[in-house]
């Protein structure tokens, strides 16, 4: 479900704050979420008690089993909370915390992000703690409603930026599931990346085999849209450092 996030109308670079270096961490991620998320993200506010309770249980279980990896407890809690799906609490897809948060992150809504900076400190520091995955091809599925934007912006040879937190998967079948949410005609991205962070060992939904690409992930379109059965396919390769001199 997170795969569809971040298809910007104009996939260009957008400056973003370094929350790890510029934010004084609060004493408790859990308390920070309880105190700040309801007003900052009212769409998901009704689910905050459930999100906090479930994230606490999942994180505690992983800590007890020695499955926290390099993450500290607060970082693990923040990451688990990001992966939760409020449909398990009777919510709608658009009420998901990760969707509401990522919408504001893609918009670079300074005031809202400032209200969420304590949580983002722990989430981004968790991503920084995880080692980059070796370069390989990951998959991302988006429904057919995104096709017009993709046709306009993802021409072969172009560079694109994904401004938010982007979810991809090691499992192509997961991407196909997301791409088919609105029926045939969705798009499966093949993303060759070397900076992804595998979060599925710490996720509340590990079956999605989720890998996160950090904000402003830059790639070039190595192969434009092609039709493959019920799906369109598009190939991206993570770009190297800029060679422009200003």
Provide a role label for each language-model segment:
Residues 1-39, 43, 199-246:
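Conserved NAD+-utilizing ADP-ribose enzyme module
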Residues 41-202:
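Internal glycine-rich, Lys/Arg-flanked active-site/core loops of soluble domains
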């Amino acid at each position: 479900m997170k795969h569809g996030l971040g298809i910007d109308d104009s996939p260009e670079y957008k400056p973003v704050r370094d929350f790890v270096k510029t934010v004084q961490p609060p004493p408790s991620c859990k308390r920070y979420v309880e105190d700040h998320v309801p007003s900052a993200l009212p769409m998901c506010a009704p689910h905050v008690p459930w999100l906090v309770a479930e994230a606490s249980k999942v994180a505690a279980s992983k800590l007890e089993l020695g499955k926290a990896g390099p993450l500290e407890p607060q970082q693990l809690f923040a990451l688990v909370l990001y992966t939760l799906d409020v449909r398990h609490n009777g919510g709608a897809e658009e009420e998901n915390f990760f969707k509401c948060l990522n919408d504001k992150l893609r918009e670079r809504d300074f005031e809202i992000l400032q209200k969420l900076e304590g949580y983002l400190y722990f989430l981004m520091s968790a991503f920084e703690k995880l080692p980059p995955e070796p370069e390989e091809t990951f998959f991302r599925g988006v429904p057919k409603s995104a096709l017009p934007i993709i046709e306009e912006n993802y021409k072969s040879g172009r560079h694109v930026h994904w401004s938010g937190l982007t979810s991809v998967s090691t499992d192509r079948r997961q991407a196909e599931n997301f791409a088919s949410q609105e029926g045939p005609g969705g798009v499966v991205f093949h993303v060759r990346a070397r900076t992804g962070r595998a979060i599925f060992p710490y996720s509340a939904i590990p079956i999605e085999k989720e890998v996160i690409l950090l904000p402003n992930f830059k790639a070039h379109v190595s192969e434009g849209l092609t039709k493959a059965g019920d799906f369109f396919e598009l190939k991206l390769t993570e770009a190297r450092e800029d060679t422009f001199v200003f």
